[in-house]
Each structure stands twice: as C-alpha cells, then as structure tokens.
C-alpha cells in the first residue's frame, strides 16, 4: 500500500495557513487515491530527545566503528524509531511556516536528531547517499510577508532560508522529486486571503496527480 506521511509543522492550529493548505491537499489526495494510507506526524506532539550525552557518543562510536554501550544503543534506537516513519512512507507532505527567516525550531530539532549516518544517509569515499531515494515530497511554505511576489519589500534571496533549507535537506537524504506550494502575505488581511485561496487551489490540483 502506498503511504503518505504528513508532517505538520505549525503550532498555530486554529489559524495556520500551512495547515489549511495541507488539509486541502490531503482532501483532494484522498479523493484521487482512496486506497492510499495517510499518516500524520504533528511535531508539536512528538517527544524528541536532546541530541547530547549518550546519543552524541553513539554517533561518534558509529563513525569510528566502536561498539555501542547499552546506554548508547538505547539512545540510538530512539533515533531510529523517530526516523522509521520516513522510511515507511512513499510520499511526504510537509507544512512549513516561516519562523525568523527559517523553519520552526521543532522541525529543525527533528531533522537534527534523525539526520544521522546509516539512518537517513550513508557516506563513503565517493560521497553521501541519501537513504530516502525514490520517494517524493510536497512542501507547503507559509510566510507572513511577501518574499517572492512582485514588489516585495523583503530581499528574498537573503531573507528566505525556509525553502532553500528544506530542499537542501530533502535532496541530501535522497528525495529529489520535490514540489513546493507557497502561500504568502498571511498577515495582510484581504490580500492574504487571496493568496491563501490561490495556494489552496494549487494544492488541490497538485494533489490529484501527486
């Protein structure tokens, strides 16, 4: 069975533009693919370990080929459990609001914890190889201001570290089939509603053939 993993990145549950667009995407996806399974991963409900102590020691033990202690092995198993949904899924949908030019710290925390050698990537003398190759991703980017629209008063190339980061990370772990859906000006009242409506329509169209 084809599985979709929806990673919900917004903590603003009632008013989130990224959640609204993702919900529209998923509704259209379900209609087009009724036999596919959709799983939701809300990073705000996810217990994640600090990457220190035993986990950090386990990382370097793995890099050096040293056997793990019992404590290190337990810490590493927790990391592998957090990464398991990404291996089990065939497709990903990310809802990513812009926070301080980048992504929410909870999403960054998850990425930092699970992006480990032999978990999401491998490397040898020829370079890095992502372990999620063959999967595809759709990413909904929500921004309060206009970063890509004509007349934007933000220098997008400098201020937008949201989309470049997500696409770099996805490619690093092997996901090269990436579709981006951008909803901007979410703080702009009526203008923001126009942008949100456009993004919802775009999401529905993309979802039908995703």
Indicate residue ranges for each PLM-predicted region.
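N-terminal beta1-alpha1-beta2 submodule of the flavodoxin-like/Rossmannoid cofactor-binding fold
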Residues: 1-105, 112-116, 201-210
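Glycine-rich phosphate/pyrophosphate-binding loop and the adjoining helix
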Residues: 153-210
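Residues at the starts of beta-strands that form the adenosine-phosphate
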Residues: 3, 37, 136-137, 176-177
């Amino acid at each position: 069975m084809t599985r979709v993993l929806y990673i919900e990145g917004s903590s603003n549950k009632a008013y989130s533009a990224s959640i609204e667009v993702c919900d529209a995407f998923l509704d259209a996806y379900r209609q087009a693919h009724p036999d596919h399974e959709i799983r939701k991963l809300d990073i705000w409900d996810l217990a994640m370990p600090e990457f220190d102590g035993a986990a950090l020691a386990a990382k370097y033990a793995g890099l050096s080929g040293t056997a793990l202690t019992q404590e290190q092995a337990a810490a590493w198993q927790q990391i592998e459990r957090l990464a398991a949904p990404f291996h089990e899924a065939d497709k990903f949908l990310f809802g990513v609001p812009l926070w301080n030019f980048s992504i929410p710290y909870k999403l960054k925390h998850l990425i930092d914890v699970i992006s480990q050698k032999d978990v999401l990537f491998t490397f040898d003398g020829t370079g890095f190889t992502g372990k999620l190759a063959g999967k595809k991703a759709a990413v909904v980017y929500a921004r309060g201001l206009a970063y890509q629209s004509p007349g934007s008063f933000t220098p997008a190339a400098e201020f937008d570290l949201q989309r470049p980061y997500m696409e770099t990370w996805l490619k690093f772990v092997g996901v090269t089939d990436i579709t981006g859906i951008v909803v901007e000006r979410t703080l702009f009242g009526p203008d923001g509603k126009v942008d949100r409506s456009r993004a919802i329509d775009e999401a529905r169209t993309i979802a039908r053939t995703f």
